[in-house]
Every structure is written in C-alpha cells, then in structure tokens.
UniProtKB/Swiss-Prot annotation:
It comes from Legionella pneumophila (strain Corby). Residues 1-19 form the signal peptide. It is found in: Periplasm. One of its GO terms (biological process) is protein import. This is Tol-Pal system protein TolB. SUPFAM superfamilies: TolB, N-terminal domain (SSF52964), Tricorn protease N-terminal domain (SSF69304). It comes from the Bacteria. One of its GO terms (cellular component) is periplasmic space. The gene is tolB. The keyword Signal applies. Keywords: Cell cycle, Cell division, Periplasm, Signal. Part of the Tol-Pal system, which plays a role in outer membrane invagination during cell division and is important for maintaining outer membrane integrity. Gene3D superfamilies: TolB, C-terminal domain, TolB, N-terminal domain. InterPro entries: 6-blade_b-propeller_TolB-like, PD40, Tol-Pal_TolB, TolB_N.
Length: 419
C-alpha cells in the first residue's frame, strides 16, 4: 500500500492514484567465511547462536560456514578451517544462580586459531537477545573495523484489517525484525515515523482526531508531545542532526511548504516558498542542507535546500518521479524512491550527481531508510499480497526479507546507533 504522500503526489500531478525467519533472496560471493560454533544445547544458548548467525548474514559481509556435527555441537577451529572458515566464534552458556553467564571467543582460523577477542558477560534471562546482538557487533567490528548495527532498532507502522476496520500501530523492533513492541495503537492512521538523533524519541503523524497532527513519543516511556496541529496538512517530520529542530510540511497557508520547528521554543520558520508542493524534507548529516521532494519542475523530483542562504538546486533528472530522498550517514550517496515505467523501486545516486541506479526491482517498493553504517537500506515492499520489510545493500548485491508480521507492515525507519 503506497503511503498517503505518494498518493497525494500522484493525484495532484497525474490525476490518478496507483495503487518468521530471515529470508536471503540474493547474496554475494565475496563475503567473509565465518563459523558459529554452538553455544550449547539449552534454549538460551541456541537463541544466542541463531541471533549471531542471523545478524552476520544480514550484514552482507559474512558467509556462514556450517560445522560437520550439526547445530548443537562444537567443532575444532582446524576442522572449520578445512571447511572454509577464516574466523570462528565459539561460546558457552552457564547458569550462575538466577543469572546467565555467557562467554565467547573469536578465533582467527587462518592463523592457527589465534584468539582475536574473548569476553564474558552475566545477564538476566530477558537480556539474551540483546546480548547476542552485542556479541554480533563486537565480532563485526573486530573483523571489519566498522561499528556493527545489530543493536540498533527499527520503527515501522503495522496495519491490521478486520472487515471494514483497521488497527494501526507504531512498532519498534530489533534490527533483524524480531522482538517487536507497540509504542502506540490507534483506529486511525499513523504515518511517517522518524527517529531522533539520540534514538530516544520518534516523531510521527497521527490522525487520531480525524485530522493530521505531528507528535513526538518517548521510546522508553511512551510520553507524547504535540508539535503541530494546524488546519490542513501536518506531515513528514524529520529531525535535525542536533535533535533541536524538526523539519515539517504544513499547508496552513495554502500549498504544502516546508517549515522548521524549534523544539525548545516552539517557534517556526518557513523554509520553502512558491506555488508548488514541497514535502518530505530530510536533513543532511552535517546539518547544512535539506533534501526535499517538489513538483516545481512539473513532476515530483528531489531538490536540495541550502540552509545557509536558502538557495535551491535540483538533484534528480532521471525518471518521472523521485521522492523520499535521504543522504546515507557518510554522505556518499542519496537513496530515494525512484519510478520509471510505472514501477516504484529503491534507487541510489552519488551525492555529487550522476545516474540513478535501481537497488530493487519489484516495482512495489517504497519508504527507504538507511542503516547508520551507510551499508544497508531498509524499505517496505509487497510479498504474497502483504506489506513486508526488505533490506538491500547499498551496492544492490545482497537482498533479503525480514520476518513477516500479521497484517501489513509499512513506512520503516532505521534508528541511529544506540548507546
């Protein structure tokens, strides 16, 4: 189901509206071969091993090597090296009173089992999955030199329909799609979730009062704050990198325009002007500019607004519809929703310009959101007539679907790194 912003653009510009376990759908051959030895046979040990394997698979940087003895046994580093593993993770789980002790080692199988990393943790039973993600982060950073993204989270909108009624919920889950928790539930639409830079709050659009309003909500406490409630459109909130401002879309003066809201004082400043529709603002990571979607050129395209002098320049020229654009955190690429021949796919363009390359090809993809390490793009798509979430690498060489939930899942947003 395409979101309302897309539908609005299509209606205004064309007069029409176009309407689990991790599943790897495409991989790469250059991934680092790694073996995950069993952490033990009990439920906690098996969950830790499964989560680590899932995490490293999601990253697109690793190829999992299976041992000869099955999932619940440990093999020697030399044996796993013979099977093709360059690195081996081995762990153990023990019960210590009412706590769980988890230890792991990362060995270099190429260098005769040289220990690269070894750590021990004590946790409560409800922290098993979180610790597994942390171990994945440790392994990933040790072997790649980059910070892992497995302890980050994702937000999305879940829609369940029963007869003529719909139930909307703003949910937060682990980066692998597991452990979902509902922050908000409503019989009216919820849209456009966006994480604050510190990962503690999410801004969103609610229609609970039969009109659009922008709120923020605390991820920890659920406490809400009303940001805007003007007549007409209140939409597409996006946080500034310092977390002190929200860029929003308001139609209180007529045509939808982009405004800046100071979250401390509540004061507002209009950023775009003219008669065209301007929407979907996204700050650059350095805070110097905004990307936004506008019809000022005749069709929805991506533009850049310099916050220093207000100058606007067009970014996209390829295709008849480009929208929902955002920079990757490293500012090397711009990821966007790209339409050609009535097919909606996720596209990527170098920040300096050039052609747009498709990362996905289903024709029903939307709402791209980039991981904090700039390597992966989370997006919404359709699979077996349901809304699901997919992940694609920034080079398009690895694609996968996240665990399916009941109902339709849409409008995902990837959190920043969480402390």
């Amino acid at each position: 189901m395409f979101n309302r912003i897309i539908s609005l653009f299509l209606l205004l510009f064309t007069g029409q509206v176009i309407a689990l376990d991790l599943e790897l759908t495409q991989g790469i051959n250059s991934a680092l071969p790694i073996a995950i030895n069993s952490f033990g046979s009990d439920a906690a040990a098996q969950e830790i091993g499964n989560v680590i394997e899932n995490d490293l698979t999601i990253s697109g940087q690793f190829k999992i090597i299976s041992g000869p003895q099955g999932a619940n046994s440990q093999s020697s580093v030399s044996t796993l090296r013979q099977l093709g593993a360059d690195s081996v993770v081995t762990g153990r789980v023990n019960q210590v009173g009412n706590r769980i002790e988890v230890s792991f080692t990362l060995a270099d199988a190429v260098a005769n089992g040289n220990i690269l990393l070894t750590k021990t943790f004590q946790i409560n039973a409800n922290q098993v999955r979180a610790l597994a993600h942390h171990i994945s982060d440790e392994v990933y950073q040790k072997l790649t030199g980059e910070r892992g993204i497995f302890s980050t989270r994702i937000a999305y909108i879940s829609v369940q329909r029963n007869g003529g009624r719909s139930r909307y919920s703003l949910e937060v889950a682990d980066a692998d799609g597991h452990n979902p928790q509902s922050l908000l539930v409503s019989s009216e639409p919820i849209m456009s979730p966006s994480w604050s830079p510190n990962g503690k709050s999410i801004s969103y659009v609610s229609f609970e009062k039969k009109k659009a309003e922008i709120f923020t909500v605390s991820v920890e406490t659920g406490q809400r704050r009303l940001i805007t409630s003007f007549p007409g459109i209140n939409g597409a909130p996006a946080w500034s990198p310092d977390g002190q401002h929200l860029a929003v879309v308001l139609s209180k003066s007529g045509t939808p325009k982009i405004y800046d809201v100071d979250l401390s004082s509540g004061s507002m400043k209009q950023l775009t002007f003219g008669n065209s529709i301007d929407t979907e603002p996204r700050y650059s990571p350095d805070g110097r500019s905004l990307l936004f979607t506008s019809g000022r050129g005749g069709s929805p395209q991506v533009y850049r607004l310099s916050l220093a002098d207000g100058q606007i320049s067009r970014v996209t020229f390829e295709g008849n519809y480009n929208a929902r654009a955002s920079y990757t955190p490293d500012m090397k690429h711009i990821v966007m929703l790209h339409r050609e021949d009535r097919q909606f796919n996720i596209g990527v363009q170098n920040t300096g310009g050039g052609p747009i390359s498709n990362l996905t090809f289903s024709g029903l993809d939307e709402s791209p959101s980039v991981s904090p390490n700039s390597r992966l793009v989370l997006y919404a798509t359709r699979y077996q007539n349901r809304g699901v979430l997919g992940i694609v690498s920034i080079d398009g060489r690895i694609r996968m679907r996240l665990p399916a939930r009941e109902g339709d899942v849409q409008e995902p947003a990837w959190s920043p790194y969480l402390s």
